[in-house]
Each structure stands twice: as C-alpha cells, then as structure tokens.
C-alpha cells in the first residue's frame, strides 16, 4: 500500500504530481511538434549548387539546382550532390526536432525516477 506522499522505493515521488507533469510535457511536445512541422529549413551541397527545402515533418518542399552543375556527361555528380543535400536536409530536420523536444523533456523534474 502506498504511503502518503509517494510510493515505496520511488523516493517520495507523488504519482499525481508526476502524472500532471507528464501530461503537461506531452501537451507541450504536441504543440512544439506541430509548430516544427510547419518550419522550413534550407540546406545545400556543392557550395550551394543544389539546395533542398524541407519541413520539420521531413517533407521536401523545394529543390533548386544551379544550371552550371547540370552536365549530361556527368549525371553521377549531380546525383551525388542531390543525395548529399537531401541527407543534410533530413539531418537538419532531425536535429531541429531533437533539440526542441530536448528543451521540453529536460525541464521535467521527477526526483527518484531515474
């Protein structure tokens, strides 16, 4: 049976307070995720030869290729530039999401839980 103020072995953590914190954090995370999904990041490769625009939802919303890098005799180079720019865009979207979510989860103070 639980003692007043917490559960045995959990350092006096009050489950009601902990649940309120978790619910608040979950709401903040949902709001932040919705905001980040609307943000557009732009990354590039080859010194700006290929640029990619990506949302926080990891949807590609734009690709720009400078005409001077389009060489019919070297399609492989263009493919490599596009791949590098897309990979960088995905990393940037992941980093943005992780960073913002970390700000929320880092604020959670639940002594004795971890």
UniProtKB/Swiss-Prot annotation:
Q: Which GO terms describe its cellular component?
A: bacterial nucleoid; cytosol
The alphabetical list of record keywords is:
Cytoplasm, DNA-binding
- Taxonomically, the superkingdom here is Bacteria
Question: GO molecular function of the protein, one example?
Answer: DNA binding
Please name the InterPro entries in this protein's record. YbaB-like_sf, YbaB/EbfC
Subcellular localization, per the record?
Answer: Cytoplasm, Nucleoid
Q: Does the keyword Calcium apply?
A: no
Q: Which HAMAP family match?
A: DNA_YbaB_EbfC (MF_00274)
**Chain's role:** Binds to DNA and alters its conformation. May be involved in regulation of gene expression, nucleoid organization and DNA protection.
- Subunit structure, briefly? Homodimer.
Q: Which family does it belong to?
A: Belongs to the YbaB/EbfC family.
Q: Which PANTHER family match?
A: NUCLEOID-ASSOCIATED PROTEIN YBAB
The protein's name is Nucleoid-associated protein Clos_2855
